[in-house]
Amino acid sequence: MFNNDPLQKYDKELFDLLEKEKNRQIETINLIASENLTNTAVRECLGDRISNKYSEGYPHKRYYGGNDYVDKIEELCYKRALEAFNVSEEEWGVNVQPLSGSAANVQALYALVGVKGKIMGMHLCSGGHLTHGFFDEKKKVSITSDLFESKLYKCNSEGYVDMESVRNLALSFQPKVIICGYTSYPRDIDYKGFREICDEVNAYLFADISHISSFVACNLLNNPFTYADVVTTTTHKILRGPRSALIFFNKKRNPGIDQKINSSVFPSFQGGPHNNKIAAVACQLKEVNTPFFKEYTKQVLLNSKALAECLLKRNLDLVTNGTDNHLIVVDLRKYNITGSKLQETCNAINIALNKNTIPSDVDCVSPSGIRIGTPALTTRGCKEKDMEFIADMLLKAILLTDELQQKYGKKLVDFKKGLVNNPKIDELKKEVVQWAKNLPFA
C-alpha cells in the first residue's frame, strides 16, 4: 500500500519549489567552481528503484540477501573508475561507496594513521579544504584536526605552494600523511616534489583531486597516480556526476592498504551504501572515457584561461596572476570590499559564486576574495568569446558593491539594505537572466 501519484499531483508545494530551483539554475550564470550539471541518464540512476535495496558490505560479501544485481553494478563502477583514470587493477584499487568527499577524506585518513595520527595539509586560507586538518586559533574547526594531530602549511605571498617550506615543516613535524590537492589553488601540483618529501619523512602521500579529477583523467594536468599512495575525488564537480566520492589506493606500493581503506569505509564509518549513487557514478564514468568528455574538459580549461585574461585586461587582481585549471581566485583588496559583499551583490543579479580567502587572509569568515570557475558554464555550451560578457558583469558587480558600501556602510547587514529595490540591481539582473536563458540546459 503506497501512493503512486507523480510529485506534481502528490505534493504540489514541494514540486513548485523544485521547479523554482530549476528555473533559478536556468536563469543564473553559475561560476561556482565546485558545481556542475548532471545529464539525464545520471539523474535517472539517482531516482531508480535500486535505492530501495540495502546492501551492507562489499560485492559477494553482503549482510543482506538479494544483492546479485547490486554486486554487478558496484563491480561495474569499480571497473570504470580504474579505466577512467587509466590505472591498472594490479597496482590500484578503489572504493566506490563513500557518500561524499568529506566522508572519503576522513575515512582514508583514519585508515592510514588512526586516531591521533599525524597529518599535514594546506591551510584553508591558502586553498586547502576543511578535511585536510583545518583548525584556527580559537578551535579545531574540522573533525580531522580533532581526530588527528594536524599541522598546516601555507602558500607564499604570491599564492604558490612553497615546497621548501613544506619540506621544513614535514621534517620538524614528522607527519604520517601529507595531503596535496586543494579547493581554491589555481595552479598545477608538484606531486613528484611531494613524493620526495614523503619519502624523506616516511609518510603517505594523499592527493585530493576533487576539483581537478577530469584534468587528471584527460591528461591535461600532472598525474598524482604516478606518485601518490591514496587519491580521493568527489564525482559531482568537474566529473559531472552525482554527489558522491571515490577513494583510490596503491595496493602494489602498500600491501594491505586495501583492507585498511575498505574496513574504514565499512563498517567503521558507514553502513549500507547508497546504491543509486553508485549506479549514477558508474553511468558518468562511462562518459569520462569518451572523446566527447575530453573535448568538454579541454574547453573548461580554455574558458578558464580566457576568463582570467579578460579579468586581467580589466585590471582585476588574481591570485598567482592567472590559472592552470578551472578556477580563478580574485583578490578584491584594492576595491576595499569583501568577498562576502560581492557574493551578495552577485546573488542579487543572478550570478552564483562564492566568497573565498586569499593567502594573506587571517579571517576565513570575512575573506578578501572570490572563487569562480568554468565547469558549469562550459557544460551549458559557453566558449572563450562568452568570457568577455562574464568579465564585464563581474566588474560591474564589483563597482556597484563599492558604491553601495560607501552609501550604506561596511557592516554586511547594512550593506544588504542597498540591494533591495535598487534599479541598478534590477537592470543588471535583467541583463544576466536574458543572457543565461539562451544557454542550453539539460
Curated annotation (Swiss-Prot):
Enzyme class: transferase
Gene3D superfamilies, sorted: Aspartate Aminotransferase, domain 1, Type I PLP-dependent aspartate aminotransferase-like (Major domain)
Binding site for pyridoxal 5'-phosphate: 54, 100-102, 236, 272
Keywords, alphabetical: Apicoplast, Cytoplasm, Disulfide bond, Methyltransferase, Mitochondrion, Nucleus, One-carbon metabolism, Plastid, Pyridoxal phosphate, Transferase
Database matches in SUPFAM superfamilies: PLP-dependent transferases
Keyword RNA-binding applies: no
Matching InterPro entries: PyrdxlP-dep_Trfase (IPR015424), PyrdxlP-dep_Trfase_major (IPR015421), PyrdxlP-dep_Trfase_small (IPR015422), Ser_HO-MeTrfase (IPR001085), Ser_HO-MeTrfase-like (IPR049943), SHMT-like_dom (IPR039429)
Cofactor: pyridoxal 5'-phosphate
Disulfide bonds: 125-364
Effect caused by changing residue 292 to E: No effect on catalytic activity
Substrates-to-products reaction catalysed: (6R)-5,10-methylene-5,6,7,8-tetrahydrofolate + glycine + H2O = (6S)-5,6,7,8-tetrahydrofolate + L-serine
Entry keyword annotation includes Nucleus: yes
Regulation of its activity: Redox regulation; active in reducing conditions, inactive in oxidizing conditions. The reduction of the cysteine pairs allows the access binding of the tetrahydrofolate substrate to its binding site. This mechanism appears to be unique to Plasmodium species.
Modified residues (N6-(pyridoxal phosphate)lysine): 237
GO BP of this protein: D-serine metabolic process; glycine biosynthetic process from serine; methylation; one-carbon metabolic process; tetrahydrofolate interconversion; tetrahydrofolate metabolic process
Subcellular locations according to the entry: Cytoplasm; Mitochondrion matrix; Plastid, Apicoplast; Nucleus
Subunit annotation: Homodimer.
Family: Belongs to the SHMT family.
Annotated function: Catalyzes the interconversion of serine to glycine accompanied with the production of 5,10-methylenetetrahydrofolate, a source of one-carbon units used by thymidylate synthase to convert dUMP to dTMP for DNA synthesis. Binds to its own mRNA and to the mRNA of bifunctional dihydrofolate reductase-thymidylate synthase (DHFR-TS) in vitro; the physiological relevance of this interaction is not clear.
This protein's name: Serine hydroxymethyltransferase
Organism: Plasmodium falciparum (isolate 3D7)
Gene that encodes the chain: SHMT
